[in-house]
Amino acid sequence: MGKKLLPGLIHRLPQNAMSRTMGKITATPFSRLAIQRYIKHYQIDTSIIEKPASEYRTLKEFFSRRLKPAARPIAPGPDTIVSPVDGTVSQLGDICEGTLIQAKGKDFSVSELLGGSEEEAKRYYGGKFITIYLSPRDYHRIHMPVTGDLSSYCYLPGRLYPVNKLGIENVDRLFARNERLVTHIKTDSLGDMALVKVGALFVGSVKVCYNTATTNIKHGRQTHEKIAGTPRYEKGSELGWFEFGSTVILLLESNELEWATGVEKGKSLLMGQALATKKA
């Protein structure tokens, strides 16, 4: 009975308010008392984090922790795209007729994901996509998958359904309905890319390094703006972070790419490992 009621319940929850409240709680000094329990529960490897766990002032600060520089080597080569995050591949494949796969029997469109811009969406038709789920135990900083220029970003307010198996299998067009922040990247030889950071239930917010854009704002409005100066970011450099677990979707325009060995549905990825390469 409980399992049958749960899918219906997630539609009725005040998801955004709950997530903002969670963000406030995890930012209190009191929350640091939960850090050691969090480490133990999720079996987090503290040997690779930037500083001792005792030096984090809040649970939110620990959650968005940085790693030691050598912890995530970046796969070299101008024709190699790397994983922007640590996580698990939930879906990947070709973008056929402007459609992405969420789960068996559940699809959604590129246009919906990018906020309804058909012009923006069409450049990815015939390209590739990969959806990577970040669990609460994962490293939650987001990095550049390639060296490229940041041309624009789009903030899309929405719901905050859970992005775990329960949400993916029971919420139609979940990733096109949840709040998200899209960064558009232009590269020298690998085509355009869109890095979509998807909000989720209990995600305090998503933040980026290139401006003050953030998510989970009360009464937030859709925004699409050019990024001042079109800054160039190197492959592997930090782009932003989640303040709790969530999902990243990477759209690749080029149809001349192939997935790297071991990049498959259900497989774990580390930030910086080879994701795709240009066909020889």
Curated annotation (Swiss-Prot):
The EC number(s) this enzyme carries: 4.1.1.65
Active site (catalytic residues): D86 (charge relay system), H143 (charge relay system), S246 (charge relay system), S246 (schiff-base intermediate with substrate)
GO molecular function: phosphatidylserine decarboxylase activity
Family: Belongs to the phosphatidylserine decarboxylase family. PSD-B subfamily. Prokaryotic type I sub-subfamily.
PTM sites of type Pyruvic acid (Ser): S246
Membrane topology per record: Peripheral membrane protein
Full protein name: Phosphatidylserine decarboxylase proenzyme
Record PTM: Is synthesized initially as an inactive proenzyme. Formation of the active enzyme involves a self-maturation process in which the active site pyruvoyl group is generated from an internal serine residue via an autocatalytic post-translational modification. Two non-identical subunits are generated from the proenzyme in this reaction, and the pyruvate is formed at the N-terminus of the alpha chain, which is derived from the carboxyl end of the proenzyme.
Role: Catalyzes the formation of phosphatidylethanolamine (PtdEtn) from phosphatidylserine (PtdSer).
Cofactor: pyruvate
Annotated keywords: Cell membrane, Decarboxylase, Lipid biosynthesis, Lipid metabolism, Lyase, Membrane, Phospholipid biosynthesis, Phospholipid metabolism, Pyruvate, Zymogen
A biological process term (GO) from this entry: phosphatidylethanolamine biosynthetic process
Cofactor note: Binds 1 pyruvoyl group covalently per subunit.
Membrane-crossing residue ranges in chain numbering: none
Domain of life where this protein originates: Bacteria
Enzyme kind, highest EC tier: lyase
Gene: psd
Catalytic activity: a 1,2-diacyl-sn-glycero-3-phospho-L-serine + H(+) = a 1,2-diacyl-sn-glycero-3-phosphoethanolamine + CO2
Compartments in which it is found: Cell membrane
